[in-house]
């Protein structure tokens, strides 16, 4: 997933790039956008950029006995400089070991409370690949939830704490992308200390639709990134590029889509 794959929101993309390239990246961000805004694919594209940065230069002893980096390269590189890398290919396939996901799910068995997001990782990867603009209903259909409601459980929160306490594998950074933190309920309070005092180079990216349903204690610890719905002309342009339809038809569809 790249920024170019996400419809519209040029200003948001530019803001995110500036945060990264100017080394002003906060440790917790909340991407807030209505269904159809592209908040999830945009967050995913941004997460990929973070974990695919080249490893920091090693430090060596200088002439005065201090430790200095071999290179004074900037901490973050522009997307154009990393999109051909092996790590970017892994991230694009959603298999990079330092990119972690958390999302609503149902227990594998009705009486089993040990289920975690990782138990659905294969389905989740397929969902993101095939339906990056999908909604909660679409996802619950994929995992055959039937009439059961998905949530993010206490067990899942403990698993997040465990995963993020480990060192990164290939990147300088670890990123947790959590979709729909509205479904954390009070269990999310287990994450507060980790969000407030994360291990070095650990980034939380929350993707939400309804600000009012997010725990205030989590909301207050995040930098808010509002994702508006794409404009009609942006939807029209995307349809012409990706759907291979006539210009007039693209214009009509964009007009009635209301950005969705």
Model-assigned labels for residue ranges:
Residues 40-41, 202, 217:
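Phosphate-binding Walker
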Residues 179-181, 206-211:
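A short beta-strand-to-loop transition that corresponds to the Sensor-1 phosphate-sensing loop
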Residues 165, 189-205:
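Conserved catalytic/switch belt of AAA+ P-loop NTPases
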Residues 2-186:
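Clamp-loader machinery-focused feature within the broader ASCE/P-loop NTPase space
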Residues 50, 54, 195-198, 243:
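Active-site catalytic pocket residues across diverse enzymes, especially alpha/beta-hydrolases
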Residues 186-196, 210-223:
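Short regulatory helix/loop adjacent to the ATP-binding pocket of P-loop NTPases
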Residues 224-260:
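Long, charge-dense, solvent-exposed interaction surfaces that engage phosphate-rich ligands
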């Amino acid at each position: 997933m790249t920024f170019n794959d996400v419809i519209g929101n040029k200003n948001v993309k530019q803001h995110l790039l500036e945060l990264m390239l100017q080394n002003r990246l906060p440790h917790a961000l909340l991407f807030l956008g209505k269904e159809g805004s592209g908040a999830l694919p945009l967050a995913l594209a941004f997460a990929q950029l973070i974990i695919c940065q080249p490893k920091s230069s090693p430090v060596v002893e200088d002439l005065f006995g201090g430790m200095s980096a071999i290179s004074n390269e900037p901490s973050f590189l522009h997307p154009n400089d990393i999109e051909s890398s092996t790590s970017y290919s892994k991230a694009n396939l959603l298999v990079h070991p330092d990119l972690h996901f958390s999302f609503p799910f149902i227990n594998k068995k009705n009486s089993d409370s040990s289920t975690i997001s990782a138990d659905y990782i294969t389905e989740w990867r397929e969902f993101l690949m095939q339906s990056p603009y999908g909604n909660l209903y679409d996802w619950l259909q994929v995992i055959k939830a039937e009439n059961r409601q998905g949530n993010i459980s206490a067990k899942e929160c403990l698993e997040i704490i465990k995963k993020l306490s480990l060192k990164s594998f290939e990147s300088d950074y670890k990123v947790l992308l959590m979709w729909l933190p509205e479904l954390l309920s009070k269990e999310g309070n287990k994450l507060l200390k980790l969000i407030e005092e994360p291990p070095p180079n650990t980034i939380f990216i929350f993707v939400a639709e309804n600000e009012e349903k997010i725990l205030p204690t989590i909301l207050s610890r995040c930098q808010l990134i509002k994702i508006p719905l794409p404009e009609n002309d942006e939807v029209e342009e995307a349809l012409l590029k990706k759907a291979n339809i006539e210009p007039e038809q693209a214009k009509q569809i964009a007009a009635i889509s209301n950005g969705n």
